[in-house]
Amino acid sequence: MTDLRSVTGPYFGEFGGRYVPESLVAALDELSAAWEELKVDPAFVEELKELHRTYTGRPSLITEVPRFAEHAGGARIILKREDLNHTGSHKINNVLGQALLTKKIGKKRIIAETGAGQHGVATATAAALFGLDCVIYMGEVDTERQALNVARMRLLGAEVIPVRSGSRTLKDAINDAMRDWVTNVETTNYVFGTVAGPHPFPAMVRDLQKVIGEEAREQVLALTGRLPDAVAACVGGGSNAIGIFHAFLDDADVALYGFEAGGDGADTPRTAATITKGRPGMLHGARSYLLQDEDGQTIDSHSISAGLDYPGVGPEHSWLSDLGRASYRPVTDDQAMSALRLLSRTEGIIPAIESAHALAGALELGKELGPDAIILINLSGRGDKDMETAGKYFDLIDAGAEQS
């Protein structure tokens, strides 16, 4: 199993593709051609690299967390600190690239979907930086549980549109953003937030996020003298996971683990564990694993984490799962919240609830792999946006709040 890194789409095995209305074909063709040209253009590559150095804050650090690791069977645990990026997550890596591309193709307006609000904040940030008009679609449920990020987007000058259809979460936000793009395709570029959707989005977003793994591979080698035994990341659509996995795909001795949102439990109706519980189908212009009923209709997902509350997953993850190259496991809401508190109290780092799914998974993984193992975790975002959820969950805010 070698040379997996060279597979660029539009298909990853049987997954991926481009199943869209005729009205979007020309826009996707334009985007695809522009990206193929720009990604090998030395001037574009250098401009993006310099932006990341002076604006994003790359390379991001790695941090070893020994007190947290004591709870993982003593395995050595290293975090890739995407939470330290400007705007607080990995999302800025993708957005700066797509915003630069938007300028190059001469469009003045960008739109995006967002769940946790991190992609929306990053997109609004890039729009402010480059002087672009910006509209963000966000499920009404998510605008309520991520109100801080809604305020950030509006402060940055973006229009935030709450989506009231369907389950009022990420899936529905993508639907409305797609409709906007169909209507305004001449002036508008859709800055897609994850490695899902129609080609070229899975490949392009992966290309823009793979810097995470490229940096981390060098950093872990420098710190430990060898590659990690396992690389772990949370998986919703899956961009942070592909971003850190990609550099290791052809290292057969490095195991890859994606931790999905199990919600109340993967065996309950309230889950977002797409690969664990789903089967192949069509959603948002691509074939991938989906949560669906016996009639093939996409069903609502559930997660305490807005960013993982999605009934699909990127096609490259579906392919890696079927190949056996990566393993995908569910983590419940309660397990994720417990890991969030544990990292906060043992290391002084408050992670995003999304990232806490990877932390929870790694706690179990460490016990399986033993004390000699090195586990690299993508800490994809910081937890500031989740303080209201965590405050309610742990009863931190009232007079009788938990003190121990």
UniProtKB/Swiss-Prot annotation:
CDD domains: Trp-synth_B. Pathway: Amino-acid biosynthesis; L-tryptophan biosynthesis; L-tryptophan from chorismate: step 5/5. Keywords: Amino-acid biosynthesis, Aromatic amino acid biosynthesis, Lyase, Pyridoxal phosphate, Tryptophan biosynthesis. It comes from the Bacteria. GO terms for cellular component: cytoplasm. InterPro entries: Trp_synth_b_CS, Trp_synth_beta, Trp_synth_beta/beta-like, TrpB-like_PALP, TrpB-like_PALP_sf. The keyword Amino-acid biosynthesis applies. Its cofactor is pyridoxal 5'-phosphate. The modification N6-(pyridoxal phosphate)lysine is found at residue 91. It catalyses: (1S,2R)-1-C-(indol-3-yl)glycerol 3-phosphate + L-serine = D-glyceraldehyde 3-phosphate + L-tryptophan + H2O. The beta subunit is responsible for the synthesis of L-tryptophan from indole and L-serine. Belongs to the TrpB family. Tetramer of two alpha and two beta chains. NCBIfam families: trpB. This is Tryptophan synthase beta chain. It comes from Clavibacter sepedonicus (Clavibacter michiganensis subsp. sepedonicus).
